[in-house]
């Protein structure tokens, strides 16, 4: 189904002039971000005009809008989600920090009963984390052990438990001393004074090698793994409430999944949302006026700059346009040649031309659009400020034209070809 566009009404009047000025300003800003070659000093975009020739549109499909069109704006949504996460994060840390300041031998410590020997049933590390399940693992990252490739699976637990349990109360020391967990947590080697030191500010010294941490009577006993990690502070200092290392609070576990705010928030689909896919062919007189300054290197580098005026007087275009209506938004973009062929198939006229006039030496599946892009042709005129005998005296004019046209193509491809798109509020 073909439709006719009232081009004059759509591109004239105050709204048409405002849209043309926005397009001119947009292209001008893009040129200011381009790295210019040595022989060009600046590129300025002065005017843009839609011309008088309308495009030829042929509707190919009505369908549901692409999922990318339902993504919320990152600037607005990310800030809201970040504030929620920061608030929840702060409340959880405040609660955990206050709980950890309590003595480790208080009666209110929540533990899963009954406690089991971690070496039963194939030594699964998950039951060992039961005394610390109320803690967020974000604040207690797992750490590898130097000298052991890949680390060990239970090091993180032993490091965490040192801040809240002392001496043989730690699972490692209890197992090494032959005390089963089912009989309770014993503390026959340390008195109440030592227990107090384990949860106070002096708990930071547990990262150092201390003879008290080793049970010399048992050959299977070993030093606390925290003493072997001087360059990576353990979680025991955080558990004890020691604030001398605030930077440790921001360490992340590499195994942790990404935070939710990194995923885009999607708008809700509605039955009235729709999308139109149409083939757009254009061979019109759209105009774009640019100026550039060419640098002359004689008799010295960048000796003088001469103005060069470039006028784009027409464009030949062939591609598939996508217009999606979602609530009060209209999203507009073009599809690349590969995406267009996959979604709506190749153009019938192009297929007939390919069958009637096969191109020797070329891949029969390669279309002209893939070779030249969506902009098939750009007509340009150049005006030089100085001429001699009707001939241009500047040698870099052709280079400047090719550079400017290449940038026009690049801006079009990057800004208007899906997944890039423009959104209009209506």
Swiss-Prot record:
Keyword line: Endoplasmic reticulum, Lipid transport, Lipid-binding, Membrane, Mitochondrion, Mitochondrion outer membrane, Transport
Domain SMP-LTD: 1-426
Biological process annotations from GO: mitochondrial genome maintenance; mitochondrion-endoplasmic reticulum membrane tethering; phospholipid transport; protein insertion into mitochondrial outer membrane
Name by which UniProt lists this protein: Mitochondrial distribution and morphology protein 12
Membrane topology: Peripheral membrane protein
Protein family membership: Belongs to the MDM12 family.
InterPro entries, alphabetized: Mdm12 (IPR027532), MMM1_dom (IPR019411), SMP_LBD (IPR031468)
Subunit text: Component of the ER-mitochondria encounter structure (ERMES) or MDM complex, composed of mmm1, mdm10, mdm12 and mdm34. A mmm1 homodimer associates with one molecule of mdm12 on each side in a pairwise head-to-tail manner, and the SMP-LTD domains of mmm1 and mdm12 generate a continuous hydrophobic tunnel for phospholipid trafficking.
Region (Disordered): 88-147, 185-264, 346-370
Main localization of the protein described in the UniProt heading: mitochondrion
Role summary: Component of the ERMES/MDM complex, which serves as a molecular tether to connect the endoplasmic reticulum (ER) and mitochondria. Components of this complex are involved in the control of mitochondrial shape and protein biogenesis, and function in nonvesicular lipid trafficking between the ER and mitochondria. Mdm12 is required for the interaction of the ER-resident membrane protein mmm1 and the outer mitochondrial membrane-resident beta-barrel protein mdm10.
This protein's domain notes: The SMP-LTD domain is a barrel-like domain that can bind various types of glycerophospholipids in its interior and mediate their transfer between two adjacent bilayers.
Lineage, opening ranks: Eukaryota, Fungi, Dikarya, Ascomycota, Pezizomycotina
Organism: Aspergillus terreus (strain NIH 2624 / FGSC A1156)
A Pfam family hit: MMM1
Chain intervals with Basic and acidic residues compositional bias: 96-109, 244-264, 349-360
Biased composition (Low complexity): 216-236
MF GO annotations: lipid binding
Cellular localisation: Mitochondrion outer membrane; Endoplasmic reticulum membrane
GO cellular component term, pick one: endoplasmic reticulum membrane
């Amino acid at each position: 189904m073909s439709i006719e566009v009232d081009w004059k009404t759509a591109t004239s009047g105050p709204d048409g002039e405002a849209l043309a000025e926005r397009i001119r300003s947009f292209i001008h800003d893009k040129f200011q971000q381009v790295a210019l070659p040595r022989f060009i000093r600046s590129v300025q975009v002065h005017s843009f005009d839609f011309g008088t020739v309308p495009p030829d549109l042929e509707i190919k499909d009505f369908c549901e809008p692409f999922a990318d069109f339902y993504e919320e704006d990152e600037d607005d949504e990310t800030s809201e989600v970040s504030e929620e996460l920061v608030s929840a994060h702060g409340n959880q840390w405040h609660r955990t920090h206050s709980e950890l300041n309590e003595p480790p031998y208080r009666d209110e410590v929540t533990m899963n009963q009954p406690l089991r020997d971690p070496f039963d049933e194939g030594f699964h590390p998950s039951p060992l984390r039961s005394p610390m399940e109320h803690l967020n693992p974000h604040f207690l990252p797992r750490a590898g052990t130097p000298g052991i490739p890949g680390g060990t699976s239970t090091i993180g637990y032993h490091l965490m438990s040192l801040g809240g349990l002392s001496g043989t109360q730690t699972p490692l020391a209890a197992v090494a001393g032959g005390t089963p967990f089912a009989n309770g947590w014993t503390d026959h080697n340390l008195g109440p004074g030592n227990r107090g030191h384990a949860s106070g500010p002096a708990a930071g010294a547990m990262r150092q090698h201390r003879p008290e941490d080793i049970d010399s009577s048992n050959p299977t006993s070993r030093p606390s793994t925290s003493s072997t990690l001087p360059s990576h502070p353990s979680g025991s200092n955080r558990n004890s409430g020691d604030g001398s290392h605030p930077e440790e609070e921001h360490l992340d576990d590499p195994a942790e999944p990404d935070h939710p705010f990194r995923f885009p928030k999607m708008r809700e689909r509605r039955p009235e949302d729709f999308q139109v896919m149409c083939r757009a062919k254009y061979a019109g007189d759209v105009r774009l006026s640019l100026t550039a300054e060419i640098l002359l290197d004689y008799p010295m580098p960048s000796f003088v700059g001469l103005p060069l005026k470039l006028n784009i007087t027409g464009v030949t275009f062939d591609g598939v346009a996508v217009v999606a209506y979602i609530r009060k938004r209209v999203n507009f973009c073009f599809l690349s040649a590969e995406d267009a062929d996959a979604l709506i198939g190749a153009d019938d006229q192009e297929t007939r031309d390919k069958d009637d006039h096969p191109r020797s030496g070329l891949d029969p599946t390669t279309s002209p659009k893939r070779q030249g892009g969506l902009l098939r042709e750009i007509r340009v005129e150049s005006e030089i400020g100085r001429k001699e005998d009707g001939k241009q005296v500047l040698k870099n004019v052709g280079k400047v034209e090719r550079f400017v046209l290449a940038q026009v193509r690049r801006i079009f491809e990057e800004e208007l070809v899906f997944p890039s798109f423009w959104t209009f509020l209506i």
